[in-house]
Structures are given as C-alpha cells and as structure tokens.
Amino acid sequence: MTEKALFITDTFENLNFKKDTSILMIEEAFKKEINVFQCEINDLFVDNNDVLVNCREINSLSEDIDTEVTKIDIDLKDFKYCFMRKDPPVDEDYNNALHLLDLAKHNGAVIHNNPCALKKFNEKVFATHFPEFIPKTLISSSINKISAFFDSHKKIIIKPLDGMGGTSIYKVDDLNEDNLKIIRTMTNSEKTQIICQSFIEDVYEGDFRILIINGCLLY
C-alpha cells in the first residue's frame, strides 16, 4: 500500500511558493512517491474519540493549484506522517488544533512536530534559554522598561511573541512619539508582552538557517 502523508498548512493562497519550507517538503514527498494530502486546522475533527481530517489529495504543486478538489475524511492514524505546518499566530484555533493532534498522537498517529512541544515552547521565548547565541533581549509589556532597554542599546528591534515571517517587526533607532505609539499598540497598552532585542548591524550581510537532526547538521 502506498504511504500517505498529511500536511496541515495555511491555505494555499497564503503560502509563499518561493520560500515556504512546507512546499519543499511536499515536493520531496512527491519524489518519494508518497501520496500527499493537505488540510487546514479547521478541517480536523473528533468522532467517538477518533481524530479525523477532511482533506484533499494533491498530485502536483502550482500557485494556482485547484483547491476545489473533493475532500475526503481520513483517520489521522491512517497516515504514515502528519506534519503540523500551520504558521502563527498561536491563537485559540491554533491551540485547539494542537489539542486534537495530541489526542491523535495518543491514539497512535505519527505527528510532527510533537503537539505537546508546540504547546509548551514558544520559539522566541525558548531562544532565551541560550543567551550566548542571541542578541541582548527584553520581554516585557512595560513601556518604561522598553524605553530603558532602548536607552541602553540605542538601536533595537521589537516584535510580537507570536509572529512569524518578518511580520510586525520594527527597528527603533529613535524613541519618538511615532515609535512610542507603535510600542503602545503592540503591547496593547501595556497588557501584552513583546520581545525587544539589540540591533545587530551584521544583519545586512544575511543569515543562515541551520537544521540539526539527531545531533547532525542537515546539509
């Protein structure tokens, strides 16, 4: 029997076909002759303790992919692999999906990444466990603390804790009224923590994404 893989993603209209790693993974699955299915998080459901998904099969990739393909219900245990590739924000819908995936994992489905790990670890907060490898960092909702952090570093980056893909990231090199207004908005009037980091000038030289699997570099 041909192996099946499920990719839980954003809508195809919102995927960047030039850089989204989910697209690269799907292409690799095609090369390995794995039957590929796709869904969004709202397609997951529970029926008598079984976690199923209303998903579509994908036979090829293109930016104008036909999303009107008839969907079918499949138990997550019937997939060789289930990849949770939905991007933030980590909102109520996202967390509800993780709860369902955790139940599916308990029932024997193979889920990547582990739903418990996704629930437990915010990737931006998790990075603070390794301070020697990241810029000077402040996580706070206090405008006074953020202002003091700016005074110490003169140039800082501010961004939400649940963002991704470069959205809502601001470089602050002057604590003028416009930037204070941005900070007030991002912190929801000092009710929501944001992450602030000292600005690294070398960012203009580009960066590298390093993937490590079982302690080995993935080339």
Features from the language model and the residues they span:
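Extended, domain-scale alpha-helical bundle/helix-rich regions
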Residues: 9-11
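Flexible, charged surface loops at secondary-structure boundaries
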Residues: 1, 74-78, 150-152, 188
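Rossmann-like NAD(P)H-binding beta-loop-alpha module
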Residues: 132-154
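Conserved N-proximal alpha/beta basic substrate-recognition cap immediately N-terminal to
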Residues: 3, 13-139
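Phosphate-binding site of ATP-dependent enzymes
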Residues: 144, 151-154, 165-219
